[in-house]
Swiss-Prot record:
This is Secreted RxLR effector protein 36. Residues 1-21 form the signal peptide. It comes from Plasmopara viticola (Downy mildew of grapevine). A motif (RxLR-dEER) lies at residues 50-71. GO terms for cellular component: extracellular region; host cell nucleus.
Length: 399
């Protein structure tokens, strides 16, 4: 109660100051300034009678009536009434302040609304689908009609056994971790900006691919066909047909060069057709070159040794990796190196031994996926032996 009364005194004193200021401009009549009134043991000084300004229609100066002064004194003596009045005034002031701030915020928002709409439109134009490495197909939304791939729990040990190691190495564990986290769902046909037919074109256009081509020229200067205009990047002698092209929108591109192959492997039209279908079937965990597909296709048609678990198949893939120069392997694996060697402080050094092991691991994983793909598409891939039932496997394709 006293707190309320103190507030009232402050308001009245302020009002008195304003009245005095106005009285200085128009000379006031003398009024008593020693009147006091007592309420609740508190003495209130009654403000001097306020003298009104001279009106235009009269020469008399009118003072505040006694009734007005009496009402003021009654209000001071009634604490509850004064408290309610102050509370209502405070609520009104607070409400007015909130409304004013809200109106200002709405005004500011309307000014920013065109900018916000522009940002929203830009976000809608951004494709939320994550891209993949090496020109592989982009991931698509879940489609139950497509084949999916799962990784077995024993995958690191299976890879170690095929490469005749005593146990999984860091490279093998890195590879399994990468393929476990990978999304194998392919992009819908025609919905992606990355065409499966142009997969290797994109890679060839990348600076690292051009660097690899130049490196190949430096390593095998005598194996290049210098006077060839159509195929300036022929491979080793006996594999001239491996340097192949593809036509997109009437423009012929030279496809990126993969590993050097032996005389038994030639990238022909059948191999290119199967390679393109393989790229469309999955979003591959590692980049796949047509040369690698060609070599795997030959192993796949072995009568008794085509199974991924067969020691002869694993040896052939390992020999392909070991026959490549370390610098060539680095260019072949490109960004896949991080998946195999690791990244940061825990990364394995890119020594010749580690690079060849990494490439061998990659080929083993991709061959198993290619094996299941081909046996699931016998109309596309003919002349295949019976599919073997694998007890141990790296991947499982569910259809």
């Amino acid at each position: 109660m006293r707190g309320t009364i103190y507030v009232a005194i402050a308001i009245l004193v302020a009002a008195s100051s304003r009245s005095s200021a106005e009285s200085d401009q128009v000379e006031p009549q003398q009024a008593p300034n020693s009147d006091f009134v007592t309420s609740d043991d508190t003495i209130y000084e009654v403000l001097p009678t306020r003298i009104l300004r001279e009106s235009r229609g009269s020469n008399d100066k009118l003072a505040v009536g006694a009734g007005d002064e009496e009402r003021m004194m009654n209000n001071l003596s009634n604490g509850n009434s004064l408290s309610e009045s102050l509370e209502q005034t405070t609520i009104k002031l607070t409400t007015d302040d909130v409304i004013a701030k809200a109106e200002e915020a709405i005004k500011n928002f309307k000014q920013l609304e065109p900018v916000l709409n522009m940002i929203r439109r830009k976000r809608q134009r951004i494709d939320p689908t994550p891209s993949n490495l090496g020109g592989q197909a982009l991931h698509a939304p879940p489609n139950p009609d497509k084949s999916l791939v799962s990784v077995t729990e024993n995958a690191p040990n299976v890879i170690a056994n095929r490469l005749e190691k005593s146990g999984p190495t860091v490279i093998m564990k890195n590879a399994v971790r990468s393929i476990t986290q990978h999304d194998y769902r392919p992009a819908p046909s025609g919905s992606s900006t990355t065409s499966a037919a142009a997969t290797d074109i994109r890679l060839h256009e990348q600076p690292i691919a051009r660097k690899g081509s130049e490196l190949f020229k430096n390593i095998y200067p005598n194996k290049m066909v210098s006077n060839s205009v159509e195929h300036p990047l022929h491979m080793l002698e006996g594999n001239e047909n491996s340097a192949h092209t593809v036509t997109v929108n009437g423009i012929t591109y030279l496809m990126a060069q993969g590993p050097a192959l032996g005389r038994k492997d030639t990238v022909n039209e059948e191999a290119k057709k199967i390679h393109e279908a393989f790229l469309k079937a999955f979003s591959l965990p590692f980049h796949q070159y047509p040369e690698e597909t060609t070599h795997m296709l030959r192993l796949l048609r072995w009568s008794y040794n085509s199974s991924p678990n067969n020691i002869n198949t694993a040896t052939s893939l390992k020999d392909l990796a070991n026959s490549q120069d370390p610098d060539v392997i680095m260019n072949l694996l490109d960004m896949d190196l991080k998946k195999l060697l690791g990244d940061g402080r825990s990364a394995v050094k890119a020594t010749e031994k580690n690079l060849k092991e990494a490439y061998s691991v990659k080929l083993l994983i991709m061959y198993e996926l290619f094996y299941d793909f081909c046996h699931g598409n016998r109309k596309l891939v003919g002349n295949l032996p019976s599919k073997s039932d694998r007890v141990d496997s790296i991947l499982k394709v569910t259809t």
